């Protein structure tokens, strides 16, 4: 059990380190006023959100199945950035520091797609 907890913490740390280097920044807690996206029924319930630069988005997995948020490389994202697997009721927050369009998927369920448009 400890090994599983350690592996999850290591994955979260790795994702945070990768995100902090660019336009995306993983944050430990959702900042006040962050935009929420629920994960339910095998989809991101709000498939596209629009926010201002410097704002954050928080994803909450409401299902029993684990899901994640995986940003695909493209403008503003030098390489793919894969967030940790979220179990039921876990959250993942990302602050967006630069304008752009950021597409993402759920790695184990690539038909689950979303987009963050930062103005």
From Swiss-Prot:
Record key words, sorted: Copper, Electron transport, Metal-binding, Periplasm, Signal, Transport
Cofactor: Cu cation
Region forming the signal peptide: 1-20
Protein origin, superkingdom: Bacteria
CDD domains, sorted: Amicyanin
Cofactor info, note text: Binds 1 copper ion per subunit.
Gene Ontology terms: cellular component: periplasmic space
MF terms (GO), sorted A to Z: copper ion binding; electron transfer activity
Domain Plastocyanin-like as annotated: residue spans: 21-119
Record carries keyword Metal-binding: yes
Record localization: Periplasm
SUPFAM superfamilies according to UniProt: Cupredoxins
Residues the entry annotates as binding Cu cation: 67, 106, 109, 112
Presence of keyword rRNA-binding: no
Involved pathway(s): One-carbon metabolism; methylamine degradation
Cross-referenced PANTHER family: BLL1555 PROTEIN
Role description: Primary acceptor of electrons from methylamine dehydrogenase. Passes those electrons on either a soluble cytochrome c or to pseudoazurin.
Protein name: Amicyanin-alpha
